[in-house]
């Protein structure tokens, strides 16, 4: 007899797992701090996964899935939790991935993020981007930053999300969260109307195309704080990705716009903790200092990493600098730090210097 959806999700939550994978021909599997492992000894059949999909989706979502073979949504079971769901076709079968969403919004301090995140989120205007691969914790970091703003400053925060993951409460700010496909048709429609809602802060769940990027730049230029995410691995790749949205002849203008409005690019990866208790965020921080703005305006993104390495006094850091700090504090192992490093050889040398007492990066 196949396990119930409730049974599997409860098991994932109890294990503090991140993702539940439901695929035909294999057992229900969870990704957690110990890696990926099956949780129930039952090989899923077509009818099992189809039944789970039918339970998760409403009539409208089923219609969209029938037309596109894709559906992304939020799903909640009382007493168990809230989940981000992706339902898709693979080799002619339905597949489901369910990611656990923490309904209690974490704080910047609880996530162990640098204190400069609190300063950045409280600036009055500009563009802040949080980047990283899928599953790197971008949404969690943004939620913590928004909660800090919500807790400390009055104003109006509007979010456009696909789907809503963390549910915020009104605190010092009024916060309105709009879900794509439920509260507005798509990002473009929501963004075309957002200024009518008199926001101080606009959160765009993800920038996927030129039109969304244009709105982000324009609203940052007109005095709003704009927050969003991109699927890019670091600051250099993020800047290159943004320019690739647009025709080549527009690049100089895009570089000038970015130099004017960009306030920070935060890139992150999740690395297993040395004590096997879970994963820790490793963050690269690029702050739009005068030197960075000059490089961005000229399109000289290749020099930005060196500038970050030399600007720790401004709150900047590279991935490898943060990995070195975490290794020094015993939070990540040498093996995992080197696996996540941008420059394995350089980080290894710095670690050897650190372990022999040589001065290193703070």
Where are these regions (language model features)?
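Short, flexible helix-loop junctions that flank or precede catalytic/ligand sites
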Residues: 1-362
């Amino acid at each position: 007899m196949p396990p119930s959806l409730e049974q599997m999700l409860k098991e994932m939550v109890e294990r503090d797992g991140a993702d539940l994978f439901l695929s035909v021909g294999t057992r229900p599997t969870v990704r957690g701090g110990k890696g990926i492992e099956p949780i129930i000894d039952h090989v899923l059949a077509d009818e099992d996964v189809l039944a789970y999909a039918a339970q998760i989706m409403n009539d409208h979502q089923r219609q969209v899935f029938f037309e596109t073979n894709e559906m992304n949504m939020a799903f909640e079971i009382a007493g168990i939790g809230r989940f981000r769901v992706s339902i898709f076709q693979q080799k002619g079968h339905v597949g489901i991935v369910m990611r656990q969403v923490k309904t209690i919004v974490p704080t910047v301090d609880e996530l162990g993020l640098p204190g400069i995140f609190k300063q950045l989120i409280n600036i009055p205007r500009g563009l802040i981007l949080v980047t990283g691969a899928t599953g790197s914790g971008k949404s969690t970091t943004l939620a913590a930053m928004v909660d800090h703003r919500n807790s400390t400053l009055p104003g109006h925060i509007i979010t456009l999300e696909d789907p809503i993951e963390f549910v915020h409460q009104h605190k010092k700010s009024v916060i309105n969260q709009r879900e794509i496909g439920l509260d507005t048709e798509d990002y473009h429609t929501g963004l075309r109307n957002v200024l009518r809602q008199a926001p101080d802060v606009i959160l765009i769940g993800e920038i996927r195309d030129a039109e969304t990027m244009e709105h982000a730049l324009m609203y940052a230029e007109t005095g709003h704080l704009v927050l969003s995410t991109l699927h890019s691995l670091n600051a250099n790749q993020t800047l290159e990705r943004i320019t690739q949205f647009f025709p080549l002849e527009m690049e100089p203008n895009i570089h000038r716009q970015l130099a004017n409005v960009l306030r920070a690019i935060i890139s992150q990866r999740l690395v297993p903790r040395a004590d096997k208790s879970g994963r820790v965020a490793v963050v690269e921080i690029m702050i739009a200092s005068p030197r960075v703005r000059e490089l961005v305006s000229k399109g000289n993104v290749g020099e930005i990493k060196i500038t970050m390495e030399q600007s720790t006094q401004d709150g900047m850091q590279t991935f490898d600098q943060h990995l070195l700090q975490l290794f020094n504090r015993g939070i990540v192992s040498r093996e995992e730090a080197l696996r996540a490093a941008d420059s394995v050889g350089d980080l290894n040398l710095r670690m050897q210097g650190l372990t022999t007492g040589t001065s290193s990066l703070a």
